[in-house]
């Protein structure tokens, strides 16, 4: 493609019933055949659930809390987004293939689309889930500034699309539920964004235990500090400001917008809230998963 702008604001394309960016669908065979390595750590999330936060925490852990080492490159190069392939711009599969082990890998794929090599290699997986109402609000603003997405339309229209699962990476409801079930069979640490906001130290300790890493308190405190929202928001290697404006327009909405729980209350009308809740109960009643919508 000669014109890089041709890749933006295009409609999503279904892969096995899941709407994905057209460019991922076009290069699906490359994603599907991705070769995981046994010492890979996979960060899996539905979009806007704390992916970049956990990516930065893991990179800090792997570098013993050395924040300068973690500024060696942008977060999307340190922790490549495996399935993201945009012709002429990025290829997550190729980036990862060229990376030395141990690799930290990012994905937003629903459990049924994850390349089988992750299961075959019994890779450790950290899944982060965030309450649906905060996700949809954050996703709406992200759609506006990250132009690989189709146009979001109005808030009302986007909310309807989200409830119908007609957004990139499909329905939030199925995503969080199926990964929750999968944790019974594989090495998956399932974390909640709200718990991380409430007590980040405790959640980082869970991650360390899962990774079988023991670090001194002093380094843990460094990791806590450098992975805090206020510090990451000002860190160009963590806040995505190094991306081209054509890809992400931070003047529309910053990538790191608020980083709080309960912001949905500033966006939903009472009628939207009631409709969303009624639909939510139906979609989630078959799961033992419980979310907090504020802390």
Swiss-Prot record:
<dbReference type="GO" id="GO:0006584">
    <property type="term" value="P:catecholamine metabolic process"/>
</dbReference>
<feature type="binding site">
    <location>
        <position position="142"/>
    </location>
    <ligand>
        <name>substrate</name>
    </ligand>
</feature>
<feature type="binding site">
    <location>
        <position position="81"/>
    </location>
    <ligand>
        <name>substrate</name>
    </ligand>
</feature>
<keyword id="KW-0128">Catecholamine metabolism</keyword>
<feature type="binding site">
    <location>
        <begin position="106"/>
        <end position="108"/>
    </location>
    <ligand>
        <name>substrate</name>
    </ligand>
</feature>
<feature type="binding site">
    <location>
        <position position="193"/>
    </location>
    <ligand>
        <name>3'-phosphoadenylyl sulfate</name>
    </ligand>
</feature>
<dbReference type="GO" id="GO:0006629">
    <property type="term" value="P:lipid metabolic process"/>
</dbReference>
<protein>
    <recommendedName>
        <fullName>Sulfotransferase 1 family member D1</fullName>
        <ecNumber>2.8.2.-</ecNumber>
    </recommendedName>
</protein>
<dbReference type="InterPro" id="IPR000863">
    <property type="entry name" value="Sulfotransferase_dom"/>
</dbReference>
<keyword id="KW-0808">Transferase</keyword>
<dbReference type="GO" id="GO:0008146">
    <property type="term" value="F:sulfotransferase activity"/>
</dbReference>
<feature type="binding site">
    <location>
        <position position="130"/>
    </location>
    <ligand>
        <name>3'-phosphoadenylyl sulfate</name>
    </ligand>
</feature>
<feature type="binding site">
    <location>
        <position position="138"/>
    </location>
    <ligand>
        <name>3'-phosphoadenylyl sulfate</name>
    </ligand>
</feature>
<dbReference type="GO" id="GO:0051923">
    <property type="term" value="P:sulfation"/>
</dbReference>
<dbReference type="GO" id="GO:0004062">
    <property type="term" value="F:aryl sulfotransferase activity"/>
</dbReference>
<feature type="binding site">
    <location>
        <begin position="227"/>
        <end position="232"/>
    </location>
    <ligand>
        <name>3'-phosphoadenylyl sulfate</name>
    </ligand>
</feature>
<dbReference type="GO" id="GO:0000103">
    <property type="term" value="P:sulfate assimilation"/>
</dbReference>
<keyword id="KW-0963">Cytoplasm</keyword>
<dbReference type="InterPro" id="IPR027417">
    <property type="entry name" value="P-loop_NTPase"/>
</dbReference>
<dbReference type="GO" id="GO:0005737">
    <property type="term" value="C:cytoplasm"/>
</dbReference>
<comment type="function">
    <text>Sulfotransferase with broad substrate specificity that utilizes 3'-phospho-5'-adenylyl sulfate (PAPS) as sulfonate donor to catalyze the sulfate conjugation of catecholamines, such as dopamine, prostaglandins, leukotriene E4, drugs and xenobiotic compounds. Has sulfotransferase activity towards p-nitrophenol, 2-naphthylamine and minoxidil (in vitro). Sulfonation increases the water solubility of most compounds, and therefore their renal excretion, but it can also result in bioactivation to form active metabolites.</text>
</comment>
<dbReference type="Pfam" id="PF00685">
    <property type="entry name" value="Sulfotransfer_1"/>
</dbReference>
<feature type="active site" description="Proton acceptor">
    <location>
        <position position="108"/>
    </location>
</feature>
<comment type="similarity">
    <text>Belongs to the sulfotransferase 1 family.</text>
</comment>
<keyword id="KW-0443">Lipid metabolism</keyword>
<feature type="binding site">
    <location>
        <begin position="48"/>
        <end position="53"/>
    </location>
    <ligand>
        <name>3'-phosphoadenylyl sulfate</name>
    </ligand>
</feature>
<feature type="binding site">
    <location>
        <begin position="257"/>
        <end position="259"/>
    </location>
    <ligand>
        <name>3'-phosphoadenylyl sulfate</name>
    </ligand>
</feature>
